[in-house]
Amino acid sequence: MGKKDYWVVWRINIDSTVSRSNGRVVPRQLAVDKPTLEEIAKAASMLGLKYEAHPEKKHPRHWFEEDYVGCIYVYKVDDYSRRSLIKKLAQIVKSSRRGG
């Protein structure tokens, strides 16, 4: 898998407890509190996307904090930009937490 073949989606990208300057990508209304890697992977699976989970990877800006461990590599598809993909993943995680 070459570097250009996938987007990296970090747990921190959809975490409502994190500021945008520290790595959150989506608006706070779409973000969820402390998302798990499993929730994000399940959302990617629900969208029918190919991905690889990497639970040991640490966010580069927060390599020393255990709260920010884990990311998934999502293979690129023409239907999404990285930002729109992360928004869609956040929506799915948020709705699954509500039970819907």
Swiss-Prot record:
Pfam family, one: SRP19
GO biological process, one term: SRP-dependent cotranslational protein targeting to membrane, signal sequence recognition
Protein localization: Cytoplasm
Top-level taxon of the source organism: Archaea
Positions in coiled-coil regions: none
Gene Ontology CC terms: signal recognition particle
Key words of the record: Cytoplasm, Ribonucleoprotein, RNA-binding, Signal recognition particle
InterPro entries: Signal_recog_particle_SRP19, SRP19-like_sf, SRP19_arc-type
Signal sequence, start to end: none
UniProt GO MF annotations: 7S RNA binding
Classification via HAMAP family: SRP19
Primary role: Involved in targeting and insertion of nascent membrane proteins into the cytoplasmic membrane. Binds directly to 7S RNA and mediates binding of the 54 kDa subunit of the SRP.
Family designation: Belongs to the SRP19 family.
Subunit structure: Part of the signal recognition particle protein translocation system, which is composed of SRP and FtsY. Archaeal SRP consists of a 7S RNA molecule of 300 nucleotides and two protein subunits: SRP54 and SRP19.
Family annotation (PANTHER family): SIGNAL RECOGNITION PARTICLE 19 KD PROTEIN (PTHR17453), SIGNAL RECOGNITION PARTICLE 19 KDA PROTEIN (PTHR17453:SF0)
Protein's name in the database: Signal recognition particle 19 kDa protein
Organism of provenance: Caldivirga maquilingensis (strain ATCC 700844 / DSM 13496 / JCM 10307 / IC-167)
